[in-house]
Amino acid sequence: MSENASAWADLTGRTLTKGQGTGNDFIFITDPKAEAVLDADLVARVCDRHFGLGADGFIRAAHTETFSTGQKILEKHPKVTWFMDYRNADGTISEMCGNGVRAFVEYLRTEGLISLEVGEHVSIGTRAGVKTVARTDTGYAVDMGPWSFIHGDAAREGGEDSQVSARGLKTPRPALSISMGNPHTVVMLGSDGKLDGLDLGVAPVITPAPENGTNVEFVVPLELEHEPGDIGVLGEQSEVGAIRLRVHERGVGETLSCGTGACAAAAATRFWGGEDAPDEWLVHVPGGTLAVTFVLGPDDLEHVVLAGGAQMVYTAQLS
């Protein structure tokens, strides 16, 4: 057995599929009973863009009952069949990925593991809870659940809770920490030039440093670009906000897109904008455009709906 085959031994003979959502790309496998041993080194080798298949993350489709988190989900949601077992490119386990869950549902559908027509929805188990995904004419819309301030009232009152230093910025910038089931730190910049001048090949430094790391989003607000109702997620809206976004993902580095990051960035920008800020946002990332909408959820909390496309790219079998 070759050195490379030995390193990938637990995936030998398995079919792997690559998919993407706004350029955020993933490797998928179907492993209903979660039998494959996905240690961090194996996942990192597969996701390596020079010596592996290359991806921002690795996603296993498994039955919900195979995970302890999934078993807890089934106590309240017994019809959640599939669990998105998500790992970052470095092999670390992550709670949630907004682009990943859209691509995951597209993977399940194209593999014949679920049937989902336009207008129908499916519930997916994740480490951040159950996510409801609806198929639309142009892709998928995900109820990402409620967003929250990581540091609570202190962040709400001051509008910031940390400082971020990044290569390309002369001085640290104030930031706001947002949870989308996973941690985010959002920084607003004043111009496209500042955003484009960032070197996100080097991880930004956050003070105080989050115990479990964080995803860092840099945003620039834009003028309104569309007439009311154009993004079509939940009907007409009096106005639509817009931002540009670049992100450094925890355990990955800079990516072309981050779904939970788009939600967190829109939430922070909307909060900074005050009571008159819109509920619908277009988030422009290097890999495309995502629509983010804030709605009242069934639990009477403010939920975030993320909409965008997802496609499968290729399928391969390791030998």
Residue ranges and their predicted role:
Residues 1-137, 185-319:
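A glycine-rich beta-to-alpha transition motif near the start of alpha/beta enzyme domains, typified by
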Residues 136-139, 172-174:
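Short glycine/proline-enriched coil/turn segments at helix->beta-strand junctions
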Residues 142-144:
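Intrinsically disordered, low-complexity regions enriched in acidic/Ser/Thr/Pro/Gln residues
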Residues 147:
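Short beta-strand-to-loop element that shapes/binds the nucleotide-sugar donor at the catalytic cleft/hinge
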Residues 150, 156-169, 302-319:
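C-terminal domain-closing interface element
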Residues 155-161, 207, 212:
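Short, conserved active-site entrance elements at the starts or edges of catalytic domains
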Residues 162-196, 202:
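Internal active-site segments that recognize and position negatively charged phosphoryl groups
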